[in-house]
Structure formats: C-alpha cells, structure tokens
C-alpha cells in the first residue's frame, strides 16, 4: 500500500511540463536539488539535450521541453511514476529512449502508471481500453 510512503516517493507529470520557461535547462534541473547526479550526463546524452544546457526553456522546442520534463521525473527516483501522455511531442528517437527509460524503471521494481494514445513496447502489464 502507499499509506506508509511519503509523497516524495511519488512523481506525477501531467500534460503540462511544469517547467520554468524563463530559466535555462540546467536551472530547471538544479531546482530539484539533486546534487551531483551520476545519471544526469548519461540521460542528457541519450535525450540529446547536452547542447541546450544553457538555453532558456522558452527557446526550446515542444519536444525538447517534454524531454526535459521527463528527465526531471527520472532523476527524481520515485517508487511510483504517473505520466499523462508521455510520448506526445517526441520524435522516433526520443520515443525509443523513453521506452527504454520506462522499462529500466520497471526493472528497478518501480511502479508506473501512464496513459498513451501512442503504441509503445513496455515490458509489463498493459491495460488497453477499447474505444
């Protein structure tokens, strides 16, 4: 049950990215006070965001903003991740990376709940609701 877990262990990302558009990509990551996270460089590389670290979020494309928001979710290291349409706005490469991230989180025995109109290859139980 979740009754004994603190709210810090649950991470939700809705259809709005919850980014501070007047700050840079790095500033948005630093707001989370994660310290020196080993995974950060790897995630930035995989999501092709390294070259945008000093760019103001308002100058990033929708897809880049989405990747940044998802990056913050994974750096948060929560036991339960809830995502609303995480694949919207992502190109094929980012879709593949996100699928890999999600499967990696499931391999770490985390729980994942998400909605999607876009097909994905997640290694877990999937409930499809017919139209």
Where are these regions (language model features)?
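Conserved ABC ATPase signature
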Residues: 56-63
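Hydrophobic anchor residue at the start of the ABC signature
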Residues: 70
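Catalytic Walker B motif of ABC-type/P-loop ATPase nucleotide-binding domains
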Residues: 81-85, 90
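Conserved ABC ATPase "signature" region
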Residues: 37-52
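Q-loop/switch helix immediately C-terminal to the Walker
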Residues: 16, 21-39
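ABC nucleotide-binding domain signature
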Residues: 8-17
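Helix N-cap at the start of a conserved alpha-helix in ABC-type nucleotide-binding domains
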Residues: 92-94
